[in-house]
Amino acid sequence: MVSATEKRRYEVLRAIVADYIASQEPVGSKSLLERHKLNVSSATIRNDMSVLESDGFIVQEHASSGRVPTERGYRLFVDSIHDIKPLSLAERRAILGFLEGGVDLEDVLRRSVQLLSQLTHQAAVVQLPTLKTARVKHCEVVPLSPMRLLLVLITDTGRVDQRNVELEEPLAAEEVNVLRDLLNGALGEKTLTAASDALEELAQQAPTDIRDAMRRCCDVLVNTLVDQPSDRLILAGTSNLTRLSRETSASLPMVLEALEEQVVMLKLLSNVTDLDQVRVHIGGENEDIELRSATVITTGYGSQGSALGGLGVVGPTYMDYSGTISKVSAVAKYVGRVLAGE
């Protein structure tokens, strides 16, 4: 059972965190009484602040200044957030409308981080779907001329690759249809690795009259699957980090390096597999030293209950946690809806 004193001290901590997030200035007992309805005396507030400092939730950086939250203080604050303020109907419609304007998967994801960085005023990042999760959805075969075919390979993550195939002998329309059906029969719903194996087998077993054309198509498709780019990130809003307070800006180069080199963020986002959970890593909770002065908020995006990748924001430890968590969660859900065609 939490005592009344403990509840009051949490309210004092909550007020300190809220004021510091708003101003990035140390918070004193006088300003707390002026801004918040704590219904206690100044002496009680000072005593509570002393206890909170002893417990490691706040710190007094200078003898004559007020207190600022520590990472432990932010963690207690975040863990105590139970009611995330939902976005307004107008905000939800604006998000969905902007994302639905994307012409393909990559454009939708690019729009998602642009939107997220604008909504949160932080740097936003999204991981493109990994090859491990991608499956071949369809392969279209379009005759450009009797001696040339266009292959259009589509994965369930929305990636589209187009390749031309030069033929040794012309194909009739009926033969193109047979070739298309055989390719889709071999490729359908397979992972990219399994698809490559299936293509190599198909090239050897195709009917004699289209075997040469099939071999050429399979060679092109195998090379296309092998040449798929490795995991990538899309970034937006890194300029937002330049407005950090003086105390935080000293670590800015390390944070920017982590974002630009991508390896650190890819490792972090690759571990995001839950579509419903928003994770908050505060300062030293981040495994990589480059991010130990920042807060990283992430969640998964995807459709049909399966995560395709992670997205989130990177910013200072004094960010608006409740608002940022709400917006990260909302954008991820709407990305999933757009990808699912809802």
Swiss-Prot record:
Domain of life the protein comes from: Bacteria
MF (Gene Ontology): DNA binding
SUPFAM superfamilies: GAF domain-like, Winged helix' DNA-binding domain
One annotated GO biological process: negative regulation of DNA-templated transcription
Chain ranges passing through the membrane: none
InterPro entries: GAF-like_dom_sf, HrcA, HrcA_C, WH-like_DNA-bd_sf, WH_DNA-bd_sf, WHTH_transcript_rep_HrcA_IDD
Function: Negative regulator of class I heat shock genes (grpE-dnaK-dnaJ and groELS operons). Prevents heat-shock induction of these operons.
Protein name: Heat-inducible transcription repressor HrcA
Gene transcribed to yield this protein: hrcA
